Amino acid sequence: PGNLGAMIQGIRNGRYLGIAGSRARKSVLMVQDIASLVPLLAEKGGVYNVCDSYHPSFRELEAVICKQLNKKIPFSIPYWAAECMALVGDCLGKKAPINSLKLKKITESLTFSNEKAMRELGWKPTRVLENFKIE
């Protein structure tokens, strides 16, 4: 599902390329953490950002996935090449593997702080890079 699912499928099928060294960082969360948070949130209420305290880069996620799939780390293309491909994708429509919106999503970091959830709920996230398993 989503971008992570597409990354796994692409690496599995040998149709995945890193972009600009895959340096963008993302906040991630193990699904098991959601289950442990529900009772805490039901009791306390409020609005919280929940994610791992460490925000892995795409390259780190690629490495974890490749290790589990016994695949080589994907080749990384320069940003300008990906941008050209994205512009073509914009013209091709929804079936294109990449377009300008997708390029922006995978090359820009998007991270959040979980400090409030940890402090107010006494919650501790599971380390994603150490515990992620492809099922």
Task: Report the location of each language-model feature.
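Substrate-positioning beta->alpha
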Residues: 2-6, 20-42, 49
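Hydrophobic alpha-helical segments typical of transmembrane helices
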Residues: 3-6, 84, 102, 113
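A short C-terminal helix-loop "cap" of Rossmann-like NAD(P)-dependent dehydrogenase/epimerase domains
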Residues: 8-19, 94-96
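A broad, structural micro-motif
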Residues: 26-29, 56, 112
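Amphipathic alpha-helical segment in the mid-to-C-terminal domain
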Residues: 31, 58, 125-126
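Mid/C-terminal beta-alpha module of Rossmann-like enzyme folds, strongest
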Residues: 40-98, 133-135
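Active-site loop of classical SDR/Rossmann-like NAD(P)-dependent oxidoreductases
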Residues: 58, 94-114
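Amphipathic terminal alpha-helices
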Residues: 114-135
